[in-house]
Amino acid sequence: MRRHTLAIAILAALASTASVAETSDPQSLLIEQGYYWQSKKNPERALETWQKLLRLSPDQPDALYGIGLIQVQQNHPAEAQKYLARLQALSPVPRQALQLEQDITVAVPDNAKLLEQARELGEPEAEREQAVALYRQIFQGRQPQGLIAREYYNTLGFTAKGSSEAIAGLQRLTRERPNDPIVALFLAKHLARNPATRPDGIRALAKLASNNDVGGNADETWRFALVWLGPPKPDQVSLFQQFLTVHPDDSEIRALMNKGIAQGKGGGTWQRDPQMTKAFKALDDGDLKTAEPLLAARLAQKSNDVDALGGMGVLRQQQERYSEAENYLVQATRLPGGAAWQSALNDVRYWNLISQSRDAQRAGRSAQARDLVAQAERLNPGQPGAAIALAGFQAQDNQFDDAEAGYRKVLARHPGDPDALSGLINVLSQSGQPDEALKLIDSVSPAQRAKFAPSVKINALRATQVGKLAEQRGDLKAAQAAYRQALDADPENPWTRFALARMYLRDGQIRNARALIDGLLKSQPNQPDALYTSTLLSAQLSEWKQAEATLGRIPTAQRTADMNELATDIALHQQTDIAIETARRGQRPEALALLGRSEPLTRNKPERVAVLAAAYVEVGAAQYGLDMMQKVVENNPNPTVDQKLLYANVLLKANKYSEAGEILREVQGQPLTETGRQRYDDLIYLYRVKQADALREKNDLVAAYDMLSPALAQRPNDALGVGALARMYAASGNGKKAMELYAPLIQQNPNNARLQLGLADIALKGNDRGLAQSASDKALALEPGNPEILTSAARIYQGLGKNSEAAELLRKALAIENAMKAKTQVAQASAPGTSYNPFVGLPGQRRQVTDLTVAGAVPPPIDAPTKSVTSNAFASATSNDLSDPFVPPSSIASIDSPELSPARRALDTILRDRTGYVVQGLSVRSNNGEKGLSKITDVEAPFEARMPVGDNTVALRVTPVHLSAGSVKAESLSRFGKGGTEPAGSQSDSGVGLAVAFENPDQGLKADVGVSPLGFLYNTLVGGVSVSRPFEANSNFRYGANISRRPVTDSVTSFAGSEDGAGNKWGGVTANGGRGELSYDNQKLGVYGYASLHELLGNNVEDNTRLELGSGIYWYLRNNPRDTLTLGISGSAMTFKENQDFYTYGNGGYFSPQRFFSLGVPIRWAQSFDRFSYQVKSSVGLQHIAQDGADYFPGDSTLQATKNNPKYDSTSKTGVGYSFNAAAEYRLSSRFYLGGEIGLDNAQDYRQYAGNAYLRYLFEDLSGPMPLPVSPYRSPYSN
């Protein structure tokens, strides 16, 4: 019974630990999830959840306990002990520490066996006593915790003397586990068993009786307790009444209650010169202003006064004018009675050496500084000053471990030394040990603090450590508050300002951060550290030009080694930024060359290598960049955590989320420097934001928000995270919420053009066209000369339907890019490294530069082969063997296939649909039909001239057509015309079709009107209107509809009309009706369906009706920007009211089965290159065709009777059908295109061939890859 109850309760007990607060905040949700996964025996998911929680709050007790418990369960006691130590280090020690300590103890095999024995003992009191003894042997005097405590106290309560202790223990557990119904039930039972507390037990059981988990047990025990109570006293009657309210039919309990109610009714020495006495007293008091004139006056009276010389030496020492002090003291020691000043002289020499060492350190002469400190140490080994100075130098050189050891060594010999103490506090603070620094500060007594140098602001230091600890926990608000407190205590400290400014940055408060740093610069415009921190802020904001300018204001002589290193960092970032911008303009070879020339700037420093590697990723050489960073890690046998984090950053840039995540998980929980902690936090933040964006793009908004929410909790006002959240809301259709999120970002950064464009994008998705327009215009006003801004604004204009304005913006962007490109080429021509050569890549010229430009080399004879050279950026990593597609070509080798800038690509996209052109084609179509009847040879020479008009296009189409069916054979005359015997001659016709067309590409709208070829036997008005658009809710879904009147081109009869030998004319059929279709395509698979209904009308031809239905599905077996392969299944059905597939008078001469079914397997391959695009399509399948019998002369009963009522036989066939089509287009130049197409259709005994060619001339230049798939130009009359 007991064991069964415990098993039921495990889940509830685990959950109760975490349910203290509402689960609306991320931490509470994670606590609940962690205990849930542990209750489900899923340690992997639980560990992942606890690690997420620790990233939010590094000291969160539930997370530390959860991971510790997993280590216990997986038999890793040493790892579990580490988490126990972390819990025990918290103040106050949380209950989870006691629980984990017990779990570790119970997991010891001997204790586990004892626990098993205790649980196996039965109900008799003697066995319970034994069980209690076993439990206590496990606890070893510690207070029982958790589930084991619950079972222990329950067992203890049933022993002779254990009731009171059991009740007290269970009462404690109910406070610790308020949502654990098992604990409440055990406590209620033991209270009910004890006569003194039975009424309390009954009340508790009454409450538990309605509990879903323990209600049945509680209800049963409730009744027993009332029976044990017996007839109630007057104040106990309500206990029975409450039970009877729930169980009104329980006569035994009612009788007991009634019984209780019924029972309740009854000497003379030498004296120093008074002036000298006064001077020395002032000197002792530190009153140098009083002492100096007195000593000077004495020396004026008596220049060899030993005490005056010695006193002046001490005064100069206190003024830190050590050379002068040494001079005075040397004179004093050489006079009679001057031996007393020897120790003062030694002291001055000691401090003079230390002063000189500090000057050397400031000048960057570290070796000389250390030599001077060593001399001072030898001069006075007992003085701590030299050791303190050395530790300070080590701290300045970031040798924090050595500095810490040095300070601690001094304090061991000179406890409480104020300089060593303050130095150690600073080192602990700088080396990422704010907790240790805080403990040390709090241990310093007021008396010790009073001895600190005036420059040591201990209260500011303490607040700074509190801020750093809050920062480590991810509590930005607490960190900001602490740093503000530190700034109040030390307002002139630039580093405290910088710490607070960093918090503002992480909270998205860029303006506040800049104002804070600039505030100090206004009052101290030339203070080196103020300028330095301002430079660092600009660096964090990637404002490299401003960083360079600010750092340049610090005189070279006053720059520290760190400042000089920062100057190199700035130079590298400026170079890489130029390279990235160059690549964005489509000049990838030039960008790679710039990066190659930047490599010496890294000086193999991992942080700089990471910057350069990230830049290679940005310009498209991702693998090369990753290899650079991988070498940094692999070349170090024991790579530091910082180096791993740098590599993870480059992996994130390259969208290698899995590899980056592995490093971040590996680093998690490891000790980090302050810089490492910040880098880790930034990477985790960026990782979550990028992953959230990726999930949003997959339309998994729930997972995207879950991924982003911890990042938002960490930095609730950061533009990156809030922008990602806004995009989620926009994707969900909640544009209002998205714009609400963007509002404070814009308020904080009103002059950020990219933010304005982000707002415009969201406004456009929310159909707020006015805001989209105004935000785009604001961005353009802020950065009118930035090609990237112009290109992005053009995309917004396109979405607003303003394609002409969009094209103008893109042309402006291209003009700016071309101007920049010219400057880059001039710069390259004069720069070292790979030479610029303007003729590389021109028609008939080399595609690489040669080695003839190498300075100092003797050129080979002109008849000798000349080698091509590669950019030094790739010299060691790649080859120029263009025959191997898997080896990336060098930067110069790729110039024959230049990357296009986004502006060029965007303009090409607009122009491709809208630019004017003229095109002349020639097409031929023929079949294997019967001569004179179903045979047709169709030759057309379509011409089209298209012009843009605003955001629309209009076109004029002129299509000469010649049709020929051959001559009707004599034996076929009965099946032609009215069946006369007169020879019909050759069946042919010629004419010219005319039409005008209109198109609005943005609206998916097309319309045309014209006339079928003039000159044909019959011509008529033809045209149509169609629309094809995506659904607004999901652009993967599309719909289309059209209404049209089109000629039926199956034969000469249906297209042009026929005339027999007797002059009878008929034919010229048109299909009049509409078609609708729906489709879905997510770039992985597609489905579609369509339906159409048409009335077929002709001259002297029986009217007919056609109904068609079809659908299909296809899969992308390959889908890349340059090639696609699809395979599908398609089905269609078609029916005509009448069979008109004949050529006698009254028939239309077109394929018109009464039942047509087709099931096919289509496949399509398409590929695109820079100048060539082609596609091949084929389909094979089964077809069933059934045609009813028909009169020879439908609609003319007299003629039908005259001819003895002849009829065509019905037919029904099932067989294999197939088709093949190939199309291609080649760009002859930026304006001339040559294209063509061939096709074959085969259905049982019918076969048709078709081919066409065309030459197109564009009125504007187009570049970039050819469209995929190719869309060949066809005659308006093509099927």
Swiss-Prot record:
Which Gene3D superfamilies is this protein grouped with? Tetratricopeptide repeat domain
Instruction: List the GO biological process terms.
Output: cellulose biosynthetic process; UDP-alpha-D-glucose metabolic process
Q: Name the encoding gene, please.
A: bscS
Q: What is the native source organism of this protein? A: Pseudomonas fluorescens (strain SBW25)
Any one GO cellular component localisation term in the record: outer membrane
Alphabetically sorted, this entry's keywords are: Cellulose biosynthesis, Repeat, Signal, TPR repeat
Q: Which pathway is this protein assigned to?
A: Glycan metabolism; bacterial cellulose biosynthesis
Q: Which Pfam families is this protein grouped with? A: BCSC_C, TPR_16, TPR_19, TPR_8
Q: Where are the TPR repeats?
A: 27-60, 62-94, 218-250, 306-339, 384-417, 460-493, 495-527, 606-639, 719-752, 787-820
Designated name of the protein = Cellulose synthase operon protein C
Q: What does this protein do?
A: Required for maximal bacterial cellulose synthesis.
